[in-house]
Amino acid sequence: MEKLAAGLAGLRWSMGAFPLDLIVSRCRLPTLACLGPGEYAEGVSERDILLIHSCRQWTTVTAHTLEEGHYVIGPKIDIPLQYPGKFKLLEQARDVREPVRYFSSVEEVASVFPDRIFVMEAITFSVKVVSGEFSEDSEVYNFTLHAGDELTLMGQAEILCAKTTKERSRFTTLLRKLGRAGALAGIGGPGSMGATGGGGGAARPVKSKMPCLICMNHRTNESLSLPFQCQGRFSTRSPLELQMQEGEHTVRAIIERVRLPVNVLVPSRPPRNPYDLHPVREGHCYKLVSIISKTVVLGLALRREGPAPLHFLLLTDTPRFTLPQGLLAGDPRVERLVRDSASYCRERFDPDEYSTAVREAPAELSDDCASPRHARLCLPAPRAPGAVRAPGPPGRLGPALPAPGDSDQDYVSPDWAGVSEPAGGCAEIPYEELWVHQAPESRADARARPLAGPDLISFGIVGPPRHEPEAPPPPVPPKSEAVKEECRLLHAPPVPPRGGGSCSKLTGSPPVLPHFPKLQPVHSPSSSLSYYSSGLQDGAGSRSGSGSPSPDAYSLYCYPCTWGDCKASESSSRPPPGPLPSTTTQPSQASRGLSEPLSGRTPSLLGADTPVVKNYHSCPPLFKSSRPQKSFAPFGALNPFSGPAHPSGAPAASSSGSISTSGVLATSSPTHSPGPGPGPQGQGYSAAPSSSLSSSEWQEPALEPLDPFELGQASPPELELVRCQEPRAAGAPGSGPCLSPLGQPKAFEPEGLVLRQVPASLSPAALQGPEAGGTLLFLTQGCLEGPPGSPREGATGAGVRDASSWQPPADLSALSLEEVSRSLRFIGLSEDVVSFFARERIDGSIFVQLSEDILADDFHLTKLQVKKIMQFIKGWRPKI
């Protein structure tokens, strides 16, 4: 052992780690391996050298221990099918509920109609079946049942059978020959002549309906019809099971002959196995529940006190291991060490005994984590400039940024924060801390040093490691430059120029990082959001593997905005110039936000001649998305109804060249009205290029007093959100080229378009729900039109329609929560249905994807309500 230990200590290990399934498939077993860096396997330390022994198929029977009169269920154990001990069948609970019954015909079985029956003796039956009531075609139907066949009863039916009778009248025979006996005999037409033949005493078929029992034969996996006239012996218990009521039997014999679950007793002292982890003692009772097969890899940890056997489930426990250098190249020194280790373990380890040991079954993930919202999962902090994209339910995605205090801190998804992970030691971090107070210093630390803790679950790193050259992360610039860097990292556009000039002459495009930061799933922070509004009902989603930002990465933050969930971002340096408070669903925050007037802005930053126009941060609709996103906005800047009035301007590019809008933006302020300002030449309208699959939102960080703008990308070219901008002072900090991050910009002339405004007399009561806040905005269906003949005409045209004359649009996928409620009232649904949809946060993008099964089974709507909604989605409108 000393010589072997010295040889093992001198081994040099490979730089990369390989998954266990790859090692088993590529390497000749047995082989040596060592746990990879950052990997975890139960019972294995980083210093252990493993001998991967062999790969085996284990078939085990899952059983529960029975205690106190067979009512208390104890721990769950796995009994191998090769277990040598014997068991005795107990009186089953089903024997008391459903006593064994015997039947002598199919008709008797049909009168009782048990769930299943067993054939006690071989049965053969033949019947002549007619294909139709008005057809002479018939065929003989034969079937044979074997003793022991298990039949599951499915229902009853009737078949048309043909019986032959003797003709007693020659006149009838003559008429039949002439084809005139149809009215007398009930069967007419010349087609019957060939069937009967001529002459007296000929046989003619008579059709009759025969009841039968429809069953499924599990031996042949076919459905068959047993006529009631079929005679034979049947029972509710298998003949093999009845024979096994007496005597002692192995687990394999019980599994092959008895239907599970079944209660068994240990009648005598079982043989001992040194590898047993659960002692099976005489007198113990067990309930055999199910049978399962799994592929395991046997291994031994080579230690000075002796080899310690262990095993890994090949498809679930797949940690990564490093291999000795020279193993794959056939180094004779390494091969000799492998042979010596195998011979050393052969004397001290019996793989057959180890495979037949009784063990306590591991807890299944489905038992502890019935839903992904309660999964006990620890996600590591990012090791690269961006986060790791993790496959999983397409809930909310967001960049996983380190906390200010500790860059090595592991993260717990928000909905999982209530469940502690003892192995990972993850701290419970409130959801808001993931998005606010993001100091650049902590991010720089996270980029500089990798994560020290173990990677409990490896997302997206299956297979050999990729040795691609990665560009080093850029250094953290000063504050103003850090804002631009964070904008780029968070899929945000660069800061627009402060001057009022047109952006159409700028044709550049902002640089894209070589490796764009990927995103990590973050579930809903709000427990009030339901399953349907979270987007978890659809698991399909496209992934982009390129270095450029994925199209569906743009739609991860804003649409459809549940503005009640938005949180205002707090600046870590100096506050923005008079931002409006965020509008949330919490009464305390809402009342605090309404108490701050617009006049509280800094006079030096907001002059009297500057129009106080509330900038609308667009949340573009998501049309025909492959997966509905959950509504949320992590930064306050994404809340259309919170934050200061930002100027925004960007070139507009549309695939069709035409610009339209999904609504008319109407702005009214309770304290201020727009003052005189520059003419239309200083204003512009911006609309992002369209995408047929997803929408894009840009986040603005809260580190710059003069906030960068947000650019929203609408989905189809015929429905885009267009916003109004106000000029910025020339020479303001952050002025730079106005570049479109999504492609080549096109020139856009705004002189021919105008946004209709709401009259100042709009009541705040017109805005209900989370839309009500410090600044009143109202968005209605409409379109951008040319300038009216007079300013009065533009102000009073049709900005806000009366509620009674509201009509739902043809495309329902852009509806807001309030408009979905109005649509349901429009088609005449009751208020309880409307309130249910509002409570479930069903907006247009989710509304158009609802199916009849969801409406009927999950929403518990009546058939009429389901039909109304489905027809309404397909384009039906009631004629009023």
UniProtKB/Swiss-Prot annotation:
Q: In terms of domain of life, where is this protein from?
A: Eukaryota
Name a single GO biological process: response to stress
| Keyword terms of this UniProt record | Phosphoprotein
Where does the record place the modification Phosphoserine? 740
Instruction: Give any Pfam family that matches.
Output: CABIT
The segments labelled CABIT in the record are 12-320
Q: Where is this region: Disordered?
A: 385-407, 461-483, 527-548, 569-611, 633-713
Where is this chain compositionally biased, Low complexity type? 640-663, 683-696
CDD domains xrefs: SAM_GAREM
**SAM domain: which residues?**
813-877
Name the protein family.
Belongs to the GAREM family.
What is its biological role?
Probable adapter protein that provides a critical link between cell surface epidermal growth factor receptor and the MAPK/ERK signaling pathway.
Q: What is this protein called?
A: GRB2-associated and regulator of MAPK protein 2
Q: Which organism is it from?
A: Mus musculus (Mouse)
